[in-house]
Amino acid sequence: MNIKTIEGNLSAKDSKFAIVTSRFNDFIGGRLVEGALDCIVRHDGSEENIAIYKCPGAFEVPMVAKKLAQSGKWDAVIAIGVLIRGATAHFDYIAAEATKGIAQASLECGVPISFGVLTTDTIEQAIERAGTKAGNKGWDAASAAIEMVNLYKQM
């Protein structure tokens, strides 16, 4: 069989990335942003080609991500936020809407929007995913964005 397989590579050279992050739970979200920045720079990205947009909470992240994707200025958008389950159903509603909103924005805009929104049951789980035991999900979201930019370039 002679089937061609096309994949994106992990070179951020000359690509432009917007990071949208929520200020709510920023003591963890800031670590995710640091992970995303580190990933882009380590993969030959330039700090001049990165901008960080801060919004109030995870519910607003999809709106900002969509606006950034529609602007035509960015090769990819990295969506970052931190949701930690509390005593009410509020977590479930915000987590579901943020997830759906980010996916919908990416599909509608044709620009990769990677998902770096933590949805955890405890603060300890969030901390683990922000650079301790379970890696840094901001890094993972940036890595996915880089790969998708390069895959899109081959389409």
From Swiss-Prot:
May I have one GO cellular component term? riboflavin synthase complex
EC code: 2.5.1.78
The UniProt keywords, alphabetically, are: Riboflavin biosynthesis, Transferase
InterPro entries associated with the record: LS, LS/RS, LS/RS_sf
| Binding annotation for (2S)-2-hydroxy-3-oxobutyl phosphate | A87, T88, R129
Sorted alphabetically, which NCBIfam families does this protein's record hold?
lumazine-synth, PRK00061.1-4
PANTHER family the UniProt entry points to: 6,7-DIMETHYL-8-RIBITYLLUMAZINE SYNTHASE, 6,7-DIMETHYL-8-RIBITYLLUMAZINE SYNTHASE DMRL SYNTHASE LUMAZINE SYNTHASE
Q: What does this protein do?
A: Catalyzes the formation of 6,7-dimethyl-8-ribityllumazine by condensation of 5-amino-6-(D-ribitylamino)uracil with 3,4-dihydroxy-2-butanone 4-phosphate. This is the penultimate step in the biosynthesis of riboflavin.
What name goes with this protein?
6,7-dimethyl-8-ribityllumazine synthase
Organism, scientific name: Chloroherpeton thalassium (strain ATCC 35110 / GB-78)
